[in-house]
């Protein structure tokens, strides 16, 4: 397992580097986040041993036991929460995650501000595609939420995140990534969390700084935790 995961990480990094070169970008400004949701702590350990330092999880409850197990083993990567954050999970989230990608309401932001002992890095999730099945604020609401978050002492707003629609051709989501970049630039933020296993090269070419790759590193996900 360890050798397979290490080889997968190397292959993904090579693809990121190629996409960055084609776009005239420095690959060093792009962080690879390994999405380890539904995969065991042993898989995270294997990826960590292969040099990966950033990992993403979707569910606070599922991730908490995994993070605590790895902490006990002195495996201390940066943890990214990329799934929806409910207010009743805020305390557990701020105690375990370094970066929260999915802030989509003032109420959740306020709850984080009240609970966090030290400033927490956050991104606003934007539903660029306007899909009813997706979470995130509408693009026209992002600036107002950003302005409100900027007033909160315990939140450091660093960027925007989106989950692109599922399509057969990755090029079809280029306008989604481009629009998020334009919105990020208009608000004046640094990070862009966009791009997953099937479309991260297009995301890199459109300015992504945080690519969230799961299947290409860890293989097909395990059975979803209920």
Language model region names:
Residues 1-198, 204-206, 218-221:
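Conserved alpha/beta-domain cores
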Residues 208-226:
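Gly/Pro- and small hydrophobic-enriched strand-loop and loop-to-helix capping segments
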């Amino acid at each position: 397992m360890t050798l397979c995961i290490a080889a997968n990480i190397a292959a993904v990094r090579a693809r990121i580097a190629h996409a960055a070169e084609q776009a005239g970008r420095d690959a060093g400004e792009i962080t690879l986040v390994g999405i380890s949701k539904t995969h065991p702590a042993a898989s995270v350990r294997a990826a960590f041993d292969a040099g990966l330092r950033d990992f993403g999880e979707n569910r606070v409850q599922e991730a908490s036991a995994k993070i605590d197990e790895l902490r006990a083993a002195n495996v201390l990567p940066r943890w990214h929460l990329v799934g929806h954050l409910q207010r009743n999970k805020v305390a557990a989230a701020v105690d375990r995650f370094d970066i929260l990608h999915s802030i989509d309401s003032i109420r959740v932001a306020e709850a984080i501000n009240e609970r966090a002992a030290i400033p927490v890095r956050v991104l606003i999730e934007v539903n660029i595609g306007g899909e009813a099945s997706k979470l995130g604020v509408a693009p026209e609401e992002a600036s107002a939420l950003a302005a409100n978050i900027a007033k909160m002492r315990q939140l450091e707003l660093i960027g925007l995140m989106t989950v692109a629609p599922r399509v057969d051709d990755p090029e079809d989501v280029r306008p989604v990534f481009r629009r998020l970049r334009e919105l990020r630039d208009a608000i004046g933020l640094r990070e862009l969390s966009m791009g997953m296993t099937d479309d991260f090269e297009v995301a890199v070419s459109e300015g992504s700084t945080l690519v969230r790759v799961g299947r290409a590193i860890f293989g097909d996900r395990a059975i979803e935790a209920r």
